[in-house]
């Protein structure tokens, strides 16, 4: 796929690859919709599990035509979400002939211990250093000759210590020095190689190669190193002094001939790209520049990239934010704590927060990392920092890290109050109360209802539809906790309206799913709820999570209506989606409880006990108490019916304590 390719053309090519394998993929359009945002073709944001499903299904479809090898290079640099994706494909594609080949440094196994052994269908192979004989064979192969000075071959072999990069770069250094000349397919010595000094380490060797460059080539390489392992010709031109710009392209070609860089596919339309031959070369060139130069060049590249991206907002927020962040940190290290430095930090944080907003739907872990970096760039009373702390609190909550989330949200609430920002304080306080509902629910119904009711007009007056949706959702949570399901449903309907008005897709999706969970609880005839859910299911579109929730609720409703065949059919369809995206039976708050409710309604006490025990264990591990109280009470009721009164008493106590 090319950076110059249009989104419709890219989607068409993806669909072509999926032709003829309908038995594997089912819904090709859904697969393309899931892949498109991942490969830069735009489209609606999807969650991580939906993205994983799309990638896995796509690879399985390709493997249906012929065995498939997927190669991941330098996996030790991968973000956790990419590692999760690789693991997902390995775990859930066992019927497809797919080989996932991951090249990595050994330290990856410190993060993913099972990848080194013990994981099904996984094995590891440690590449040993080249033996002396193989090292010498590599030298002869690269030179195209056996007629080499034995002493030189021996010195290179000894210094390389089995590292093929060292061998390659040593021979390249001899070419740089004019001691080797190419004739046809062979390299010929131009003088006595017996006295050549071989640097003792790869770092010294690479530094020596860079020292041999002329001044202009060196400057080009140093500016390229600030851009990154892959760099853009136009960016290096922009970062160069006006008098040097005309020669940058020629110097890049000279660096290609010297095998320090090579042409690379660009991810920016209409821009020529190159890549350093090895990351160590890039690091060596980068370290040769001063901190002041790095700060200026990082800032300059961020400005160039933003100018290139005009009209395509948001696509490179993370990269722009990274370079502004580096410029800020180098200025701080130099003691330049002035207005310009503070402004750099603010701009960097804004970009990182925007990037977090973009990736949160599909990569909550990555979004949290971006927010943490943004927070460190801002003063403690900066509203932008407080907003980032609130978002990070929500992320920590979703990870089940309740104590960290509680501390972050309490801190954000206090800081927002200190600067007198009522809207920001309301956001922080409602988020804090939402968390406390899970961990310390005593006496929070009235307080949450009061806070939400006071906050709603503030949000509406400020035009803050996201805040208004949060306030209505908080009202619904309070009403649900009090058993007032009709009022809860009314509040959630308002939350959905505000979320849709906000234009924030993920918020609207979350609110719709929360509203669906009330279908089997609201006080109305079952048939009416079935009709509502059926109509909603017909118009659900490509939101697989919402489809799953609706199918699960229809399973409960049909069970209430006594139509067990329809109930089991809808439950099976819901679970097919759940397992398909590898979200373990939904989430611990709702997923398992759907099966338990159906089991309770049909007097299947063994299944009800199994599901409720599992749900209680999960909630207890998370430190969640509000739902645990309900599940423990339901389990106690099941145990009474099974005449296991001592165990029932234990769960009555757990429910009361929660």
State where each predicted segment sits.
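Conserved P-loop NTPase "ATPase switch" module shared by AAA+ and STAND
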Residues: 62-82
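Residue register of alpha-helical TPR repeats
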Residues: 322, 350, 387, 425-429, ...
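Amphipathic alpha-helical segments of tetratricopeptide repeats
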Residues: 303-307, 356, 373-376, 410-421, ...
């Amino acid at each position: 796929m090319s950076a110059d390719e249009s989104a419709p053309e890219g989607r068409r090519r993806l669909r072509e690859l999926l032709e003829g394998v309908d038995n594997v993929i089912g819904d090709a359009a859904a697969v393309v919709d899931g892949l498109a945002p991942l490969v830069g073709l735009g489209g609606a944001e999807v969650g991580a599990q939906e993205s994983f499903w799309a990638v896995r299904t796509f690879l399985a479809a390709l493997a249906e035509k012929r065995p498939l090898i997927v190669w991941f290079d330098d996996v030790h640099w991968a973000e956790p979400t990419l590692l999760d994706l690789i693991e997902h494909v390995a775990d859930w594609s066992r019927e497809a002939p797919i080989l996932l080949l991951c090249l990595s440094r050994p330290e990856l196994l410190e993060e993913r211990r099972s990848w080194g052994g013990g994981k099904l269908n996984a094995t590891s192979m440690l590449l040993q250093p080249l033996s002396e004989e193989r090292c010498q064979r590599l030298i002869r192969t690269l030179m195209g000759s056996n007629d080499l000075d034995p002493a030189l071959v021996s010195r290179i072999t000894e210094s390389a210590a089995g590292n093929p990069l060292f061998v390659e770069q040593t021979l390249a250094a001899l070419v740089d020095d004019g001691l080797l000349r190419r004739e046809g397919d062979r390299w010929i010595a131009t003088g006595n190689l017996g006295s050549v000094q071989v640097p003792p380490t790869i770092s010294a060797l690479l530094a020596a190669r860079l020292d041999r460059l002329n001044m202009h080539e060196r400057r080009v390489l140093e500016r390229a190193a600030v851009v990154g392992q892959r760099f853009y010709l136009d960016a290096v031109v922009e970062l160069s002094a006006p008098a040097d710009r005309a020669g940058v392209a020629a110097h890049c070609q000279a660096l290609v001939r010297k095998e320090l860089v090579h042409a690379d596919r660009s991810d920016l339309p209409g821009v020529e790209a190159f890549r350093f031959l090895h990351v160590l070369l890039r690091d060596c060139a980068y370290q040769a520049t001063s901190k002041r130069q790095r700060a200026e060049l990082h800032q300059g590249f961020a400005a160039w990239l933003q100018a290139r991206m005009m009209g395509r907002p948001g696509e490179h927020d993370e990269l722009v934010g990274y370079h502004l962040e580096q410029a800020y940190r180098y200025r701080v290290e130099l003691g330049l704590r002035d207005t310009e430095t503070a402004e750099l930090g603010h701009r960097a944080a804004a970009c990182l927060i925007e990037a977090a907003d973009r990736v949160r739907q599909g990569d909550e872990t990555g979004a949290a990392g971006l927010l943490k970096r943004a927070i460190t760039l801002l003063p403690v009373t900066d509203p932008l920092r407080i907003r980032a702390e609130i978002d990070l609190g929500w992320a920590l909550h979703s990870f089940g890290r309740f104590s960290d989330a509680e501390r972050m949200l309490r801190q954000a609430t206090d800081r927002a109050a200190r600067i007198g920002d009522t809207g920001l304080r309301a956001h922080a306080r409602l988020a804090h109360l939402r968390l406390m509902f899970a961990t310390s629910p005593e006496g929070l119904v009235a307080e949450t209802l009061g806070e939400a009711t006071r906050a709603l007009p503030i949000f509406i007056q400020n035009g803050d539809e996201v805040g208004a949706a949060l306030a209505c959702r908080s009202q619904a949570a309070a009403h649900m906790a009090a058993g007032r399901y009709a009022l809860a449903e009314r509040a959630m309907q308002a939350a959905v309206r505000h979320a849709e008005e906000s234009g924030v897709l993920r918020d609207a999706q979350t609110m719709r799913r929360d509203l669906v969970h009330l279908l089997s609880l609201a006080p109305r005839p079952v048939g009416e709820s079935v009709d509502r859910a059926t109509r909603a299911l017909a118009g659900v579109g490509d939101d697989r999570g919402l489809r799953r929730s609706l199918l699960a609720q229809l399973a409960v409703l049909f069970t209430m209506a006594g139509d067990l065949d329809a109930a089991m059919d809808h439950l099976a369809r819901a679970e097919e989606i759940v397992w398909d995206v590898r979200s373990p039976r939904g989430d611990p708050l709702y997923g398992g409880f759907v099966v338990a409710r159906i089991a309770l309604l049909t007097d299947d006490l063994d299944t009800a006990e199994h599901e409720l025990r599992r749900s209680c264990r999960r909630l207890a591990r998370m430190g969640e108490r509000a739902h645990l109280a309900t599940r423990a009470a339901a389990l106690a009721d099941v145990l009474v019916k099974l005449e296991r009164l001592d165990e029932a008493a234990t769960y009555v106590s757990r429910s009361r304590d929660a």
